[in-house]
Amino acid sequence: MRILITNDDGINAPGLEVLEQIALELAGPEGEVWTVAPAFEQSGVSHAISYTHPMMIAKLGPRRYAAEGSPADCVLAALYDVLQGARPDLVLSGVNRGNNSAENVLYSGTVGGALEAALQGLPAIALSQFLGPETEGLADPFECARTHGARIVRLLLERGLWDGEDYRLFYNVNFPPVPAANLRGHRVAAQGFRRDTSFGVEPHMSPSGRRFLWIRGGAQQSPTLPGTDAAVNLEGFVSITPLRADLTAHDRLAELEALIG
């Protein structure tokens, strides 16, 4: 098996090392693991692509590259340059430092990397490690993802749904904020929504008198509706959410047509 991995936390992020370990276990001794990851932090860039300026790319070692671009850029760089046409069997993005549940899905560069792979017709999975009070004292905050990641990916490869639609199905996996031994299992869960925890701004003044703003997110420990992704994560379960890039509100098409068609 040939596996391509990327992330949004950058080439030196600890979560990427976790994903490399997961990918090597899945690929086996006869397989290949290729890493093409951002040279710098790209958290929050979603599915951005850098088509207005050139993307520098550097080979760091065997099958290991850093690109000065987003996770989606890295997937494109891998498919159309680094791999020289040898398409991967699977694309993994992560393991993100922090959850990509609920509304975070829309901002996540980790999800954006998997989304681009899906648009390119490839099986893709985004993986993230929810952090919280129970992970703060761990020597390895990624312990849950490191221990259970390969098993969850293998489960999806062997028993998950995969299709060839134009907006191809891909998966968003979040590991709960618990030690590996405390994992309660996994749940298929819809994307949730944390009320009153959306992004906002925090104003400041520089020593020179210039006003500046920090973008700040809301409380990540707020649960979503029962059975949705963040809710099951906070209950100690891995959440597995099938996604598509198609943002059409299909449940409203007929109603809107009746009103204005």
Curated annotation (Swiss-Prot):
Subcellular location: Cytoplasm
Disulphide bridges: none
GO cellular component: cytoplasm
Cofactor: a divalent metal cation
Signal peptide start-end: none
InterPro entries, A to Z: SurE, SurE-like_Pase/nucleotidase, SurE-like_sf
EC number(s) on file: 3.1.3.5
Entry keywords, A to Z: Cytoplasm, Hydrolase, Metal-binding, Nucleotide-binding
Catalytic activity: a ribonucleoside 5'-phosphate + H2O = a ribonucleoside + phosphate
GO MF term set: 3'-nucleotidase activity; 5'-nucleotidase activity; exopolyphosphatase activity; metal ion binding; nucleotide binding
Cofactor note: Binds 1 divalent metal cation per subunit.
Binding site for a divalent metal cation: 8-9, 43, 96
Keyword Magnesium: no
Record flagged with keyword DNA repair: no
Enzyme class, broadest EC rank: hydrolase
Family of the protein in this entry: Belongs to the SurE nucleotidase family.
Cited function: Nucleotidase that shows phosphatase activity on nucleoside 5'-monophosphates.
PANTHER family for this protein: 5'-NUCLEOTIDASE SURE, 5'_3'-NUCLEOTIDASE SURE
Protein name: 5'-nucleotidase SurE
Organism: Cereibacter sphaeroides (strain ATCC 17023 / DSM 158 / JCM 6121 / CCUG 31486 / LMG 2827 / NBRC 12203 / NCIMB 8253 / ATH 2.4.1.) (Rhodobacter sphaeroides)
